[in-house]
Amino acid sequence: MAPSVTIDNSSDFSPITTNFKTTSFNPRTLLLAPPSIASHEEKLRNVLATHDRTVTDLQMLDRLSAGLVTLPESTYDLVLILTDADGTRVESKGLLTRDVFGKITQALKAGAKLQAQDGTFGQEIDGAEYQEAILSGLVAEGGVMLKPDYSASVAVPLRLRRKDNSKNAAVSSAGPAVSMAAVPLHGKRKSVDMTDDVPEKDVPKVDSPKNDAPKGVGFIDFSDDFDAEDDDDELIDEDTLLTEEDMKKPLAIPPECAPRAGKRRRACKDCTCGLAEKLAKEDADKRATADSQLQALKLDADDLAEVDFTVQGKVGSCGNCSLGDAFRCDGCPYIGMPAFKPGEEVRLLNNDVQL
């Protein structure tokens, strides 16, 4: 008889996964270790011995800073930053950037704590760690950094008073309250007296408005004289505010408007210091001086020089120099001069051509 063989199809390498649920009785802890402590197995083992490994996670701080690992959101009740191998936190401080603080804050539960192993985290208010922790959303309380619990705030509902609609009465916009009446939807409509149930003595009299004007429309009294001056307004003459002594006082020119050496400063658009008037007066004086100098330069008859434009028997290349600008070429030296006869004497008197 041949021997029987039994084959086991079950996998021998199936890992056993255990889901640890975070409750108030087993708070989860995250240990952030600097790179230097990884080479000191004894120190790392001593730290892990003081924590329950079922609810404690260990992450390297340099890998978190480089973005190689991600932290679950709102998971940990305590995040503990371990010291370096030499007992200081010089290496860990260099890795705690603003991005790392943001990741740690997201991983903390509401009301969770962020501490250091040596207890020096967040003790210096002027330190960079304290400022970055505050900027990431943590608050300092009792010497530790906490993530505030905003769920504790309770929204208070605002209730508004409502009118009591329990009464079966309808209020008309044009009269008193009337009782409700049922109107059939099919067949002929019955005339319903809306005031049958209301006694006449209880019905107040409503005066009809005098003006049947639509709402929101105003009226203007055109009898008012809008152009007339209001007697209640007291007008002040500006000239009476200054005395003769005030007018004699020199204007106080600001230092920035004072004349300087070099390029002349231009006055402001709405100048009030007197610089605009001063510059205008200087320009007027310069123009008057130039005009007086031009008027003084006059030539007498003896000082006039005779200008002979042509020579008898000599003509230009085009032969039209004496005919006028309409017949002269572009390079003619007589452009702008009136037509003349060849050999005619031309005199200049006060910039005017005298033929």
Curated annotation (Swiss-Prot):
A motif (Cx2C motif 2) lies at residues 329-332. GO terms for cellular component: mitochondrial intermembrane space. [4Fe-4S] cluster binds at residues 318, 321, 329, 332. PANTHER family: ANAMORSIN. Residues 257-273 are annotated as: Fe-S binding site A. The gene is DRE2. It comes from Botryotinia fuckeliana (strain B05.10) (Noble rot fungus). Monomer. Interacts with TAH18. Interacts with MIA40. Belongs to the anamorsin family. Keywords: 2Fe-2S, 4Fe-4S, Cytoplasm, Iron, Iron-sulfur, Metal-binding, Mitochondrion. One of its GO terms (molecular function) is 4 iron, 4 sulfur cluster binding. The C-terminal domain binds 2 Fe-S clusters but is otherwise mostly in an intrinsically disordered conformation. The N-terminal domain has structural similarity with S-adenosyl-L-methionine-dependent methyltransferases, but does not bind S-adenosyl-L-methionine. It is required for correct assembly of the 2 Fe-S clusters. The lineage of its organism: Eukaryota, Fungi, Dikarya, Ascomycota, Pezizomycotina. Residues 189-214 are annotated as: Disordered. Its cofactor is [2Fe-2S] cluster; [4Fe-4S] cluster. It is found in: Cytoplasm; Mitochondrion intermembrane space. GO terms for biological process: iron-sulfur cluster assembly. A motif (Cx2C motif 1) lies at residues 318-321. Residues 23-156 are annotated as: N-terminal SAM-like domain. This is Fe-S cluster assembly protein DRE2. Component of the cytosolic iron-sulfur (Fe-S) protein assembly (CIA) machinery required for the maturation of extramitochondrial Fe-S proteins. Part of an electron transfer chain functioning in an early step of cytosolic Fe-S biogenesis, facilitating the de novo assembly of a [4Fe-4S] cluster on the scaffold complex CFD1-NBP35. Electrons are transferred to DRE2 from NADPH via the FAD- and FMN-containing protein TAH18. Residues 318-332 are annotated as: Fe-S binding site B. Its main location: cytoplasm.
